[in-house]
Every structure is written in C-alpha cells, then in structure tokens.
C-alpha cells in the first residue's frame, strides 16, 4: 500500500466538487483520489467527507472514507447507491459502516490497480474502538476488481459473506480475506440467513443473486427458477424480468431502463437510406443517458467529457458545447510580441519562438528585428534557426501588425506565412499594419492566402530584389477607404519581366504573390484547392472530379472510377455516383451494407444481392442474414439459437406443426362437445321452470331501474342558426328551441346525424342519447331532448364559451391559479359521477370540456362512452380511431377501457390546462407514443406547476392501472390544493390577475352576433320550476346555522330576519345596499347528489360573488307562470308536492324549513347566465352577465374593481362603525371545536344545504351569504364552487382563527 503524498489534492478537490442532476433526477457527486492521505485536522476531515457525499446517490469516482473518529455521525452515507470507481475504508474508528443502500461498485478505477473494495486497519490500537459491522446489506455487484478485507480487529461477519456471488470475476487473486479480522466475541448469523449475513439480525442476511440462479440465466436472477432470470442488462439483481426491473444497470440507465447503449445521435432511416439526426438522442454521462450534459462538460460524439481530445476543438452549436474534429490543425491562440506572456519581448527570437508552435491566432503583433534573427550577444540570445520559422505556417490571423525588418539571408520569400488570411490591425506601428523594410534577399512575398488587411496602411520599401508586388490589386484587401499603400524603391517591374519573374498564365488579371499557379490571387479558368488548373479531371486522372462553378471537386470515395469517356460522378455525395465502387444501398453508394445500424425503433440488417445492391433481411433475422427469407438468417452459438443448418431443421419443424394442428383439432372437438352438452342441460332446466309457471325473475341483477325521462321534440320547435362543428356521425349546430305554445327562446346545441349513415350509426347515435339522458350532474352537459326527424337530432345545452381548450388558450394571460384548480376539481367530480354510474368516457380531453361560465365547466362528448354491466370491470373496444396521445398504454395495446384508463386521460387533460392549451407530445408521431410510454417517458412538468401538482399527474400515468388514483381521491386532492392555490401553482402576476370576462370570449361573441336576444332564456332556467316569492332577509352579521341540518337529506334553507339597520340585498349574482327591497327566492325541485370525497376534504367551496365583476343594480322581482313547475321533475315517478306556506319562526328567532319541500344535499353555485333574460312586460332588465356589471350607471370606479387580496375569516363588515356592533359580530368557540381548526385540511363538520338555482335573476340561498371586510370594502360570499370549506356550519359562539392560507377568488 503506497499512501499518496499530495495533501493539496484535498483542497483542490474540495473547491472543484459539485453536484449535478442527470435526467433521472439522481444526485451525482464527484469522488476523490487521495488514497490514505488525510487532513491534519480530523474535524476538517469529517466536514470534508460530509460535504462531499451528503444527499449523494451516485459517486462519479472513488468513495474514500479514511481517518474518521468513533463518535462521528455517518448516516449521510445511506444515500449512496452506486460508486463508479473503488470504495476505500481505512484507518477509521467508527463501529458501523452505514452504506446500506450501496448496490453496485463498478470499479472503473481500482485501488492499487487491483481492488474495487478495500477495508483495512479500521481500529484504534490503544483503545476499544473500531469497525465491527459492514452495513453493505444491499451490495450485490462488483463489476470489476476484487475485494480486500484485512487487519480489522473488531470486524465480524465478513468471513460469512459469499463474495463469489458479488464479484463478477471471482478469481482467487482478487479475494483477500485473512483471519486477522474479527474477534472471539462475534455472534452467529440469524437462523433465517443460512449462515451468510452482514450482521446479527434477520434484516442483515446476504441476498444471493448469481450463484442460486438457474443455469439458463446468463446474469443475475431474483429466484431459483428459469422464469426468474434478470434481463441481461441488469447488474446487482432485479425485481422482475424486464429491463426496467433492474436494481442497477450493467451499461447505461436510460430513464429507468437498462440499455446497451444510449440513443445515438444519428439513426439509420430505411426510407432515405441515410443516417439522420435523432431528435431523441441522449448522451452518456457515467452510467446514465442524459438529454443534456452538465454545464461543465462538453459533448464528444455521444458522450459527456470534461475536455476535448487533442485532435478536436471546442465549439458551441445551438447553445451546446461540442467537440468537433479539426480540419487541419486545432485552433490555438497565442500571445504576440508585447502582449501577455511576451509583454517584455521586443522581437521574435530563439528564446520565445517555441511559444508559437501550433498557434493559429496571434493576439498581438509579430516583429522580426536584427537582434532576433541574427542573435543578441549582449543578452546571450543566439541567432534563430531558419527552420524554426516554419512554426508560423499554422498562423491564420494576426490581430495586431506584422513588422519584418530582418529575415534570414538564405530565405527568398515569406512562404512561412502561406496560411495567413487576416491582418487585423487592432494595434498599429506608426499607422502601419504591414511593414517590410530593406530585405535584400526577398524576391517574392508569397502571402498566397492573405484575403484581408482590416486596418492600417502598407509600407513596402527598399527591397531591391522584390518582384510581383506591382501585379497585386492591394485595394481588394482593404476594409476601409482610408487605408493607404506606400510601395517604393523595390525592383523595377520591367526588370522583373525581362527575367521572367511574371505571374503564371493560369492566373487572372488580379495578380499574384509569386511564381507558380499556386500564387494566384484568382484563377483564369479552374482551381483545385489553391492551385489554378486548365481543366478538371472529368474523364481521366488519378482522382475523378466534377465541376462546381470554377472549382474542381473530387468525387465521393464510394464512386467507382469510370473509363471510356464516362463521368464518374455528377455532383457531391455518394448518391451522385455513376457506378458504386462497393455496394449500393438505395440511391447511395456504401462501403458495406448496413449490419446492425441503429434505426428509429430497432437495428437494421441488410444483405447484398449478386448485383451488389443492399436489401433488408427478413424481420425474423435479428443478427444478420445472407438472403431475403427467414432460412437465410445468421445465428450465433452464444445467442442460444439453434446452429443446425436450415435443411436439417425443416423436418423437425414440419413434424412440430403437424402435431400441433392435431392437438388443436382434438381440443376444439372436446370444447364443442362440452359447450353443446351444457347448452342442452340449460334448455332442459329452462323448460322445467316454464312448465311450473315460475313468476320469479330468472336472472335478477339487483340494478336499480333507470327512471330518467326522454323528451321528444318536434322539428318545428327547433331552428338552426349556424354550424359549430362536425363529429364522427354528424354535424353540431347552434340553434334555438321555441317550445310549442310558448314565446321563450332557448339557445341549444343541435347534433344532427348524417343522412348517409347506416343503421349501425343510428343505433350508436341513440345509445349516446340514452347515456346523456341518464346522466344528471352539474358538471356534465345535459340532454334536453331528441327530435325523431328523418335525420335524428340530439338537443343539448349550449355552452356559451366553447371548449375549455380554446378558452384557456385565448385567456391564458388572465387565468390564475384559483380558476385552474377549481376546473380540476369540477372535472374530477364529473368523472367521479360517471365512475359511480359505471360509465367509461374513453375520450376525456380539454377539447371535450365545455365552459358554461368562467367558474363552471361541464364534460361533454359521450360519443365514445360506454356503460359497464354490473359484473364488468373493463370494456373491450373494436375498431375505430382513438385519441392515442390521451390514452393509457393498455388502451393502445389491447383496446381495454376502464375507469382507471379515464384517470390517465384526466392527467393529460390537467396537463393541457396547466400549459394553457399545450399539445401533448407535440412533434412526436402518434405511432411512436406506445414505445415512448413503455420506456418511461412522460409529459414534462408544466412551468407553473409545483412538484405537488406534477406528482398527481405522474400518478395518473402509472403503467399499472391499479396504481393510479381514483377520481374520488383526485377530487379530494385538488380540493385541498384549491384552498391554497398560490402554494401549488406559480403564475407571474397571479395576485393582480382578473378573471376573464365571459363577454370577451371570441366564441361567446360569435354566438351572440346572429340572434336577437329578446325573450332568450337559459335551458336550465326553463326546465327547473319556480318557487313562490319569498322576501329576502336583510342582515349584515353572521346568521346561525345548525350543523345538524346537513344530514343525508337536507331541508330547504331557512329564512332569516334583519339583525341591523343596514340592509343588503342580493340581486343577479351581486349584493346592493338598499332599504326594504325584496327579492324573490326560487325553491329547488331537483336534487343532484354530490359524490362523497375523502376524509378531510369533504368541505364545499364558496367563492366571493364579486370575484368576476362588481356590484349589480337592483332588479325588479319576477315570478314565472305556475305551468313551468310541471316542466321537469327529478323523480318522474313522484308528482311535485304541494307548496307549503312559508316557514315559521322557532323559539330562537330562526325561520323553520318549509314543509313538503324536496330535500337538497348541497348548495348550487350562483353562475353567470351569458344569455339575456328579458320579459315582454319589462319586469326584468337585459343582462349581459349578472356578475360583470357595475352598481352605478357610470363607468366602474377604481375602488369597485376586483383585486386579488386575501380575505380574512375574522374580519366582518362594520357598517355602523360602532364598537358594540363589532362586539355583536364576535363568536366564541367551544372547547371541543378548537382542535378542528388547528389544521384547515381536517375540518370535518357538516355543511349547510345548497339550493339548485339555475337562473341568476333569483336569490341564491340567503342562509349562505356572509360579509367580510377586505381593505375597507364589503363583499358577499356566494357558493360558486362546492370544493371549499366555509365557516357556515360552525355552531353559534364559535370564533374563527386567522386564515392559514391566502386564497384568490375564493373565501375560505
């Protein structure tokens, strides 16, 4: 053992250590490599260890635990599950090693190049402290390396461990366990551990996952049978046979699935026969597949690396740092003369020229003076070796200036700068960026790549032998018009021409830098690279080319060289070859046919035919083939497949097929005889029953009769206005229903069956009518009637604001957290109602939820819904189109639909709401959705959702249907969240957001454009009968409600008498301060049962009536005719009872319930009626919406606008401003009721009744209206949503605590 000596490594690693999060949310931390070195301060040593590994699950490196005292808390190590390097435990004094969740040690690095697990010298020599137990009870895999356990004085049970089961390569040299471990005081393993354990109890038994497996298993297992083998990609054991059941992965973990390799960056497209970019690609980061590398890593091919290799350079593409191969030499920036590390240098000389090796960019200047070229004896600098000047051949840019005042006499040009492209001129030498002075040996410049001199002037003078300079058009190199050229006292042009020092004939008139075709500024005809040529090698030459303008480009290497005057290629790439050199795959020439290339969903194998063209192998060939049929598949012995030749296996296959068919015939005949005998027996029994005149039902189901009524409408009562959309069987119109003999107009939606449909469509259409007529719930669209015209027509309520998907998309900037959570509750309650009636919706989505008002949504489109019989648990669908992206996996694969598959669709619907109309799996083809779901991928977490809301969605998307929550649980969960909306949804500006006015909806405006709203009446207003006028009570303080009144059946709300002089009257969904104004009260006649919710979430929701608008003007009372009371009855088997007189006052001064009224179970919300209710006698005013009007005729005042401010439960309206008035409003709390308010989630007292009001012109039950003071304003409470617990059910004398949460749009 050689202890490391670099103590500084600790400090540097402490600074560099960080934790990143891979895609599967596992915490990853960096390991250490200090071996036995430790800090001198043991306290600091412990703190460093804790800082490294607290909350760490995967250690990317080595886990080293050394020099820890006996009294230290090491419980933070329980989070470690995987170590990629080695585990070292040495020189410690603690008793127990708490690595209880460590499952795998990969051993990518080994201690002493040999051991993956090293445990030694863990005791104190002068004391009784030391390691006694290894808490490695879940360690089942060491992929590489051995185990060393030695010199642990107090260690027990280590010699009982079956290390050969843990170590993948258990060679004897890899296992070192000597007898110096342990003492005589060690106990025995528990009797259930069969002699192998990590500790004394039954929880410390060793789990064997390899040596107990069946011989057919090629890896780990979870039982002794053949069916208990783990997937071959599993490491450390598993809980099932799938690749998602592994405890750890042998190679890579891809979102919970163990795979051989991560999804590659490029996949083979069998349609285009090319490798294409894979949008689902992931990068390997350790043993994980991640969508994005950590910020301090770069992408090299398909892996995350700390730095690019020497042959690649780091570039950034689309925000991703990547390693790209260098075309020639990798970019390298170096300091120039007078900058950075060469700040004190005056010239390039032999002492600093090596600093320019492999430099491509010079940040600064290059200066060549006599003291650098010929040496400086004064400073002991030798003359420069001319060969070393070739280091400048890699330079492509000089940001400053180039100053050459001295040059080796044996060099006649500056060809070492042949790759110089740009002289930046950011720093100038007396205004010059290029200076060449008094170089007598220079004959040509040879700056053949120079394209730009960005700034500064040119000065070339006193070079007596320099030619070619006069042929160059220097202005083409300049970037500004202010640059100047000073060229003089060089060799005369005529002398140069006389000696033949002229440009090559292939150069253009732009000139040249020197002799030869490679020194031209541009070519007269064609160019190949930098060299000008006469013509391209189209038909001859060693390398064949094609012409791309004036540039000759070499053909692809896969093109075969053609003879006899034929072109080898017609353009770039392997798809433009005249003939392929090797093989042809589709239009492309390839070196070999695809053999195991990764495709979109599988690996691609192809074979070559005699014409050297590639063709796909048979689908059964999973490892390659030699021909097109399944007989040509290639099999390998190690795969477990038969290696017999095909002709030898054919007789066996034929015999097996014949034997199988014979057995099938025998089984079929036996089954037919059994069915026939059973049928005969059943007929005989039935005949005996009929002969005895049995009057009892033969098959009583126990199911209650369906007593819903179906209204038959005449075609003359319906008027179509405009088309709203089309469905599977017909078209939906906006229409008007004018009941026969009446003058009211009711806006409806009319669904008409297409005339071309057949009998089956008629049956399914009427089945839909049956389902809709049987459903009666506030959050389900109601069927009004059926018209049996030649084309069947279904008439339903018209939802004025369209579907919820378009509504949230249109108003996404105005929708807050309260409204979103209220919608979630309402949809869950509607689906809970369907589940109680054994109805599977099958097409739940935001597009199939309609908006009656901003606070009220309803589920529609029962076109796919199916009722389950009493003994059915699932529905098996036949053909037809299905909304794949909203469906559970079992629905896609097996077309099995249950209530739990509706829960999956509910999760997707909630995701649509939280993304304000986002498209699920946008951009992913539908056919790829099943594979995506099986791999564990789900919709991402919406930006506004907290982890609490997103986890509810994730639970809805569990593969196991029984693991998904019930709608009853979902309603309770979202009810709880809706009590504190801003805790669960984070929306910018939520506090300042106003609810969108229904009148602003584009869908709503389109509905109102084409129809006069005179005599318009809402459908529910028309159907629900009216009660007698009841003068409303006027009060300002809290009224008393007996909590005993909210039993299974509820009585109508009692009336209350005024309790102060200041009177408030509720009109049209708002309150107005008036004196002595009476408002009619409508008694309910139909009971809509509310499905129960989970314990602790049984409270109703009561919203502020002014949430969506301001106070209303007073409206004159109105009563409809008595005939309307006969229009609808909740129970068609019972006649409407006689109306009883008004209730009487009890002994405490409260109004007693009216007799013979149908009992109500809860209060209906007061909702906006978007249509106008106006009578011809003028007794009602036209209302656009009762919750969106001001109390005054003028424009709304600033103080009347709705603002999102918290409402406090213990603040009340003090209209009199007197102390005694406030005193009357304070309630006292009984002792037994105090505990119920410690946590508002557990308020479980009874609730007040709620009446069914479907028209906003009438008074909401006044027993539920209380007033609170909010910043000096008085606002009423209206039962808008039955999801919030109100304080009504408190007994008299109860004092409410301060509000624990802040709510928007709702008063708790």
From Swiss-Prot:
Residues 1117-1150 are annotated as: Disordered. Changing residue 1301 to A: No effect on interaction with WWOX. Abolishes interaction with WWOX. Loss of interaction with YAP1 and stimulation of transcription. GO terms for molecular function: ATP binding; epidermal growth factor receptor activity; epidermal growth factor receptor binding; GABA receptor binding; neuregulin receptor activity; protein homodimerization activity; protein tyrosine kinase activity; transcription cis-regulatory region binding. It is found in: Cell membrane. Binding of a cognate ligand leads to dimerization and activation by autophosphorylation on tyrosine residues. In vitro kinase activity is increased by Mg(2+). Inhibited by PD153035, lapatinib, gefitinib (iressa, ZD1839), AG1478 and BIBX1382BS. SMART domains: FU, TyrKc. Monomer in the absence of bound ligand. Homodimer or heterodimer with another ERBB family member upon ligand binding, thus forming heterotetramers. Interacts with EGFR and ERBB2. Interacts with CBFA2T3. Interacts with DLG2 (via its PDZ domain), DLG3 (via its PDZ domain), DLG4 (via its PDZ domain) and SNTB2 (via its PDZ domain). Interacts with MUC1. Interacts (via its PPxy motifs) with WWOX. Interacts (via the PPxY motif 3 of isoform JM-A CYT-2) with YAP1 (via the WW domain 1 of isoform 1). Interacts (isoform JM-A CYT-1 and isoform JM-B CYT-1) with WWP1. PANTHER family: RECEPTOR TYROSINE-PROTEIN KINASE ERBB-4 (PTHR24416:SF90), TYROSINE-PROTEIN KINASE RECEPTOR (PTHR24416). This is Receptor tyrosine-protein kinase erbB-4. The lineage of its organism: Eukaryota, Metazoa, Chordata, Craniata, Vertebrata.
């Amino acid at each position: 053992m050689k202890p490391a000596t670099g103590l500084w490594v600790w400090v540097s690693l402490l600074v560099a250590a960080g934790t990143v999060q891979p895609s599967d949310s596992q915490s990853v931390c960096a390991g250490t490599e200090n071996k036995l070195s430790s800090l001198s301060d043991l306290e600091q040593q412990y703190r460093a260890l804790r800082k490294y590994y607290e909350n760490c699950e995967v250690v990317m490196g080595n886990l080293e635990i050394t020099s820890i005292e006996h009294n230290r808390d090491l419980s933070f190590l329980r989070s470690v599950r995987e170590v990629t390097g080695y585990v070292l435990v040495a020189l410690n004094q603690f008793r127990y090693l708490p690595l209880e969740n460590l499952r795998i040690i990969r051993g990518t690095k080994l201690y002493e190049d040999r051991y993956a697990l090293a445990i030694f010298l863990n005791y104190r020599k002068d004391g009784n402290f030391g390691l006694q137990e290894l808490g490695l009870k879940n360690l089942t895999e060491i992929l590489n390396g051995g185990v060393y356990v030695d010199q642990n004085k107090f260690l027990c049970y280590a010699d009982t461990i079956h290390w050969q089961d843990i170590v993948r390569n258990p060679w004897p040299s890899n296992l070192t366990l000597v007898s110096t471990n342990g003492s005589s005081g060690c106990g025995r393993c528990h009797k259930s551990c069969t002699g192998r354990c990590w500790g004394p109890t039954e929880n410390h038994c060793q789990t064997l996952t390899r040596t107990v497996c069946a011989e057919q298993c090629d890896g780990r297992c979870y039982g002794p049978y053949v069916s208990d083998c783990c997937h071959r990609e599993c490491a450390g054991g598993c809980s099932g046979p799938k690749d998602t059941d592994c405890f750890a992965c042998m190679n890579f973990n891809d979102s919970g699935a163990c795979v051989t390799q991560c999804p590659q960056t490029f996949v083979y497209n069998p349609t285009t026969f090319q490798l294409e970019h894979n949008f689902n690609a992931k990068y390997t980061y350790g043993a994980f597949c991640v969508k994005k590398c950590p910020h301090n890593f770069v992408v090299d091919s398909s892996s995350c690396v700390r730095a690019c290799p020497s042959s690649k350079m780091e570039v950034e593409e689309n925000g991703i740092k990547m390693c790209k191969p260098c075309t020639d030499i990798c970019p390298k920036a170096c300091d120039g003369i007078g900058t950075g590390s060469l700040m004190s240098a005056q010239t390039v000389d032999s002492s600093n020229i090596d600093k320019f090796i492999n430099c491509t960019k010079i940040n600064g200047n290059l200066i060549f003076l006599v003291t650098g070229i010929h040496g400086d004896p004064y400073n002991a600098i030798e003359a420069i070796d001319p060969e070393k000047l070739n280091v400048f051949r890699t330079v492509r840019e000089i940001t400053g200036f180039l100053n050459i005042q001295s040059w080796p006499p044996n060099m006649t040009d500056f060809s070492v700068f042949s790759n110089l492209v740009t002289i930046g001129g950011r720093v100038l030498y007396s205004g010059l960026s290029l200076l060449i002075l008094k170089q007598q040996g220079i004959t040509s410049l040879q700056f053949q790549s120079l394209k730009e001199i960005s700034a500064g002037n040119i000065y070339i003078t006193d070079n007596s032998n320099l030619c070619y300079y006069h042929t160059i058009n220097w202005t083409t190199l300049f970037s500004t018009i202010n640059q100047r050229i000073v060229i003089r006292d060089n060799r005369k042009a005529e002398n140069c021409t006389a000696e033949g020092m002229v440009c090559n004939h292939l150069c253009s008139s732009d000139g040249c830098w020197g002799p030869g075709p490679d020194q031209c500024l541009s070519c007269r005809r064609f160019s190949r690279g930098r060299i000008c040529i006469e013509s391209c090698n189209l038909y001859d030459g060693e390398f064949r080319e094609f012409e791309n303008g004036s540039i000759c480009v070499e053909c692809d290497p896969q093109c075969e060289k053609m003879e006899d005057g034929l072109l080898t290629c017609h353009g770039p790439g392997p798809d433009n070859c005249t003939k392929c050199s090797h093989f042809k795959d589709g239009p492309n020439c390839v070196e070999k046919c695809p053999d195991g290339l990764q495709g979109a969903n599988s690996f691609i194998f192809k074979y070559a035919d005699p014409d050297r063209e590639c063709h796909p192998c048979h689908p059964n060939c999973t490892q390659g083939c030699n021909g097109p049929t399944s007989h040509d598949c290639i099999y390998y012995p190690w795969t477990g497949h038969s290696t017999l030749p095909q002709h030898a296996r054919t007789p066996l296959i034929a015999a097996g097929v014949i034997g199988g068919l014979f057995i099938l015939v025998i089984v079929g005949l036996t089954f037919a005889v059994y069915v026939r005998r059973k049928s005969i027996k059943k007929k005989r029994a039935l005949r005996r029953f009929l002969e005895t005149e049995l009057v009892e039902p033969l098959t009583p189901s126990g199911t209650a009769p369906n007593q819903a009524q179906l209204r038959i409408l005449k075609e003359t009562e319906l008027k179509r206005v405009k088309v709203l959309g089309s469905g599977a069987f017909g078209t939906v119109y906006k229409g008007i229903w004018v009941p026969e003999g009446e003058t009211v107009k009711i806006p409806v939606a009319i669904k008409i069956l297409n005339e071309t449909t057949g009998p089956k469509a008629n049956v399914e259409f009427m089945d839909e009518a049956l389902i809709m007529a049987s459903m009666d719930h506030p959050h389900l669209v109601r069927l009004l009637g059926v018209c049996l015209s030649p084309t069947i027509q279904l008439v339903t309520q018209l939802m004025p604001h369209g579907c919820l998907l378009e509504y949230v998309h249109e108003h996404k900037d105005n929708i807050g957290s309260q409204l979103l959570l209220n919608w979630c509750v309402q949809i869950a309650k509607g689906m809970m109602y369907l589940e109680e009636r054994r109805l599977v919706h099958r097409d739940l989505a935001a597009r199939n939820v309609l908006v009656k008002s901003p606070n009220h949504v309803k589920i529609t489109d029962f076109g796919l819904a199916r009722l389950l019989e009493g003994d059915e648990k699932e529905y098996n669908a036949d053909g037809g189109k299905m909304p794949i992206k909203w469906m559970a996996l079992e629905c896609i694969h097996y077309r099995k639909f249950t209530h739990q598959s509706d829960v999956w669709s509910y999760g997707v619907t909630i995701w649509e709401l939280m993304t304000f109309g986002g498209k699920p799996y946008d951009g992913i083809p539908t056919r790829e959705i099943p594979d995506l779901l099986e791999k564990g991928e789900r919709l991402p977490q919406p930006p506004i959702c907290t982890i609490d809301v997103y986890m509810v969605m994730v639970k809805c998307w569990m593969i196991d249907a029984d693991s998904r929550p019930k709608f009853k649980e979902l309603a309770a969960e979202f009810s709880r969240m809706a009590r504190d909306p801003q805790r669960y949804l984070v929306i910018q500006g939520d506090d300042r957001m106003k609810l969108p006015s229904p009148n602003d909806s584009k869908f709503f405006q389109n509905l109102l454009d084409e129809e006069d709203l005179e005599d318009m009446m809402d459908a529910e207003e028309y159907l629900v009968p009216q009660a007698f006028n009841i003068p409303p009570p006027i009060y300002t303080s809290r009224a008393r409600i007996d909590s005993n009144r909210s039993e299974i059946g509820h009585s109508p709300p009692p009336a209350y008498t005024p309790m102060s002089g200041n009177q408030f009257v509720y009109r049209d969904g708002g309150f107005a301060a008036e004196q002595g104004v009476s408002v009619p009260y409508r008694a309910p006649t139909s009971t809509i049962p509310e499905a129960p919710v989970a314990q602790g979430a049984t409270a109703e929701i009561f919203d502020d009536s002014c949430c969506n608008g301001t106070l209303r003007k007073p409206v004159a009372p109105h009563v409809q005719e008595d005939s309307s009371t006969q229009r609808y009855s909740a129970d068609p088997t019972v006649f409407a009872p006689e109306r009883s007189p008004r209730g009487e006052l009890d002994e405490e001064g409260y109004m007693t319930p009216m007799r013979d009224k149908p009992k109500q179970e809860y209060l209906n919300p007061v909702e906006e009626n978007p249509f106008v209710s106006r009578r011809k006698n003028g007794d009602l005013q036209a209302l656009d919406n009762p919750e969106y009007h001001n109390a005054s005729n003028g424009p709304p005042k600033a103080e009347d606008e709705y603002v999102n401010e918290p409402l406090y439960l213990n603040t009340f309206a003090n209209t009199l401003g007197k102390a005694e008035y406030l005193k009357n409003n304070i309630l006292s709390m009984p002792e037994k009721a105090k505990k119920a308010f410690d946590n508002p989630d557990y308020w479980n007292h009874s609730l007040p009744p709620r009446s069914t009001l479907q028209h906003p012109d009438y008074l909401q039950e006044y027993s539920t209206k209380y007033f609170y003071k909010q910043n000096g304003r008085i606002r009423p409470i209206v039962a808008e949503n039955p999801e919030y617990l109100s304080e009504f059910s408190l007994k008299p004398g109860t004092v409410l605590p301060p509000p624990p949460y802040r709510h928007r749009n709702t008063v708790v």
